[in-house]
Amino acid sequence: MSITVAIDCMGGDHGPHVTVPSAVEYLRHDRDTNIILVGRPEILTKELNALNISPDSRLRLYPASEIVGMDEHPAIALRNKKDSSMRVALNLVKNGEAQACISAGNTGALLATSRFVLKTIPGIDRPALAVVLPTISGHTYVLDLGANVNCTAEHLFQFGVMGATLVSSVENKPNPSIGLLNIGEEDIKGNDVVKQAAGLFRSSGLNFYGNIEGDDIYRGTTNVVVCDGFVGNVALKTSEGLAQMLASYLREEFRRSLFSKLAGLVALPVINAFRRRVDHRQYNGASLLGLRGTVIKSHGSADSFAFRCAIKRAVDEIRGGTLRRIVEHIETLRYNIEQNITQPASVE
């Protein structure tokens, strides 16, 4: 199955210096994928020349004259920059020339422009950002990570459906478990929105584990963790800060004395193995679910390895039929609700 993805090459902290080499390297390992590099041709050509690479049938350039700044207001970018590399890449998906768009650019602008250009799937009110986080038992998918600060119970339910479908399609895991992030496991805990969302999950036939707490995320208690964008973003940023603090503490302790430096040398293989397990770069690429097209948001500061992981995430979603399966599952759930059918609606 041949796949074509469009890359917003001008977005992110490093722009073409990372996106272009990442695309070239990715194509060396995936012969069934084609990439469209979107941006200013003269800049993209310069990057390709530095790599001794010329555009061909698998790697082609598509011109876009404007760039969305990382601190630019989403509404201004949407209204005034119709030829930005971000918007042109999304238009390629809309027009069927590409099956996915990948951008490391301004998150707010990407959310607004994606929703405007691609529109949402019927039955989905709002798109949600889903990210993979490492756990004791492997990894889990968390959504929403910031696309929606204020959510209704129905929104949270839709996030759960999309997250479960993502897991089942990308990882071939039938009927993945769903947990609702709360301040306690008991049914009486949480605000009205969370309580109502729990009721929707219980009556849906989905594999709903129940309420989970923050520490359950990294225990891997469930395959999918559902929360609103405010809670999800705070949880993610808190985790990133904790990881940085622990890394700083370790560096300080191993440099404290000659003995600790020697201990650090002895422990180096273990430390390197630990780093590989928790390396956030391998999880780069947040999926913007709920749109009529595949959109992946890379971290703005991603290096080449991390950006290649974002490309792979897009390709995996396309190969797994994630978008098609979300549409089908939402339609099934809507039909069951309309017909008052109560049999299980498991995600396959």
Swiss-Prot record:
Family: Belongs to the PlsX family.
Any GO BP annotation: fatty acid biosynthetic process
EC number: 2.3.1.274
Cited InterPro entries: FA_synthesis, Phospholipid_synth_PlsX-like
GO cellular component assignments: cytoplasm
Catalytic activity line of the entry: a fatty acyl-[ACP] + phosphate = an acyl phosphate + holo-[ACP]
Cell compartment(s), UniProt: Cytoplasm
SUPFAM superfamilies for the chain: Isocitrate/Isopropylmalate dehydrogenase-like
Assembly, per entry: Homodimer. Probably interacts with PlsY.
Pathway annotation from the record: Lipid metabolism; phospholipid metabolism
Principal location class: cytoplasm
Lineage: Bacteria, Pseudomonadati, Pseudomonadota, Betaproteobacteria, Nitrosomonadales
Keyword Lipid metabolism: yes
Organism: Nitrosomonas eutropha (strain DSM 101675 / C91 / Nm57)
Function: Catalyzes the reversible formation of acyl-phosphate (acyl-PO(4)) from acyl-[acyl-carrier-protein] (acyl-ACP). This enzyme utilizes acyl-ACP as fatty acyl donor, but not acyl-CoA.
Protein name listed in UniProt: Phosphate acyltransferase
Keywords linked to the UniProt accession: Cytoplasm, Lipid biosynthesis, Lipid metabolism, Phospholipid biosynthesis, Phospholipid metabolism, Transferase
Superkingdom classification of source: Bacteria
Molecular function terms from GO: phosphate:acyl-[acyl carrier protein] acyltransferase activity
